[in-house]
A protein has these predicted regions:
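Rossmann-fold scaffold of SDR-type NAD(P)-dependent oxidoreductases
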Residues: 4, 65-73, 96, 119, ...
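N-terminal Rossmann NAD(P)H-binding glycine-rich loop of SDR-like oxidoreductase domains
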Residues: 7-11, 15
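Rossmann-fold cofactor-recognition segment
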Residues: 36-49
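Conserved mid-core segment of classical short-chain dehydrogenase/reductases
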Residues: 73-90, 131
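Catalytic Tyr-X3-Lys loop
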Residues: 82-101, 142
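Short alpha-helix in the Rossmann-fold core of NAD(P)-dependent oxidoreductases
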Residues: 93-100, 130, 138, 197
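Catalytic loop of short-chain dehydrogenase/reductase
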Residues: 116-141, 146-154, 162-166, 172-175
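C-terminal helical subdomain
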Residues: 160, 179-239
């Protein structure tokens, strides 16, 4: 398995969960992963020119990957769209979208056989909640990126998944700084912290890995909310309620 952004948060959770399953784990991140047994290379995905060489160093000799998880991403600031600069939006797009294009292109060019590619997306990609700006736009673009590449990976299943709320460093910001009165979506997030609705990174990673094979029941290139797999009735009711608004 190959994971991006594996030094902390969900990416580190995936690495730990995969190692516990006895899998061979490859990863890249800016800071490096501290878990023993991970084949790791430091790589700033925002520095596009350096990414192919880092991947070649990491995956030299690897002929097949059962699973690639495109996890690396940034949130940006929660604030009005009017106050969000093109530079900020560009940074979100660079990390959350275009770095993944570079990785996907490299996998095609290098000829490594890949069974499944999963991009870590978000409900923000479809909800359009106030203040989420570059994060929402870039995750929506990631969903479409994977849909488009599904035509170019005929022997690989691609999907974007919204993994649900996860208690990572991102939540330290979301649960403290932005005003939930101004940005209503934060109310649900803050109420969920400390409950089973918001597991830690390792538990969240385990939850995704338990259902990752079932993503193949959807068309390649699909966007899937994890609740469609673990709580389909709850998800259907939620979507129905939103449509009535």
């Amino acid at each position: 398995m190959f994971i991006t952004g594996n030094s902390s948060g969900l990416g580190r959770g995936f690495s730990a969960a995969a190692l516990a399953r006895g899998w061979e784990v490859y990863g890249c991140s800016r800071r490096g992963c501290d878990l023993e047994g991970v084949h790791d290379v430091r790589c700033d995905l925002g520095d596009f020119a350096t990414v192919p060489a880092a991947l070649e160093q990491l995956l030299a000799g690897v002929e097949r990957l059962d699973l690639v998880i495109l996890n690396a991403g940034i949130l940006g600031r929660i604030k009005p769209m009017h106050d969000t600069s093109l530079e900020e939006l560009g940074r979100s797009m660079d990390i959350n979208v275009w770095s993944n294009k570079i990785i996907l292109d490299w996998l095609l060019d290098f000829g490594i056989a890949v069974d499944q590619i999963v991009g870590i997306s978000s409900g923000a990609a479809v909800l359009g909640n106030k203040g989420w700006n570059g994060y929402a736009i870039s995750k929506a673009a990631l969903n479409m990126l994977l849909r488009l590449y599904s035509h170019e990976f005929p022997d690989t299943h691609l999907a974007a998944i919204a993994p649900g709320l996860i208690d990572t460093a991102m939540m330290d910001y979301l649960c403290v700084e932005p005003d939930p009165g101004e940005y209503p979506a934060l109310g649900r997030i803050r109420a969920a912290r400390g409950t089973d609705t918001m597991p830690g990174p390792r538990a969240a990673a385990e939850r995704v890995l338990e259902v990752v094979g079932r993503l193949k029941t959807f068309d390649s290139g699909s966007f899937v909310d994890i609740r469609q797999l673990i709580a389909p009735e709850e998800y259907a009711a939620l979507m129905q309620a939103r449509q009535k608004r």
